[in-house]
């Protein structure tokens, strides 16, 4: 029961309530939509969008922007990052260790919902201005 509570999906679809963050959220949603279209054009199939794990007293929470499946069955957990320019290292450089750990945690919770664990990897789609870069196996769970 403790594991279920720690890894409980918060049921959110990522839809916000608006307010001051609406512009940022809309921009993020648009980036995810662009990334998804790019990956689907490469043959990947969407499994789930915005998979979230709720925070709890002893849980850090986390989110995976996109979960897709390769033709060979590999499950791909994708973090989408967008920056208007490549200053400060660009979009890919903005994913620090703490963010990677939250993505890995959410992915591990998602994997626990499956009967069998398929091969998986962690990709990043970096959107810098008009440029989209797909970084396969950008980081690992270790």
Per-range role (PLM):
Residues 45-75, 142:
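Active-site metal-binding core of divalent-cation-utilizing nuclease and nuclease-like domains
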Residues 130-142:
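Short, low-complexity, polybasic intrinsically disordered segments
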């Amino acid at each position: 029961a403790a594991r279920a509570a720690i890894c409980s999906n918060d049921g959110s679809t990522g839809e916000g309530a608006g307010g001051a963050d609406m512009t940022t959220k809309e921009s993020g949603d648009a980036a995810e939509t662009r990334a998804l279209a790019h990956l689907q054009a490469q043959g990947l199939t969407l499994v789930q969008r915005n998979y979230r794990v709720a925070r709890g007293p002893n849980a850090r929470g986390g989110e995976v922007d996109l979960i897709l499946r390769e033709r060979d069955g590999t499950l791909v957990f994708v973090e989408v990052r967008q920056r208007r320019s490549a200053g400060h290292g660009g979009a890919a450089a903005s994913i620090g260790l703490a963010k990677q750990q939250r993505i890995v945690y959410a992915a591990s919770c998602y994997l626990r919902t499956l009967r069998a664990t398929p091969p998986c990897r962690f990709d990043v789609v970096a959107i810098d201005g008009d440029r989209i870069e797909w970084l396969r196996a950008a980081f690992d769970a270790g």
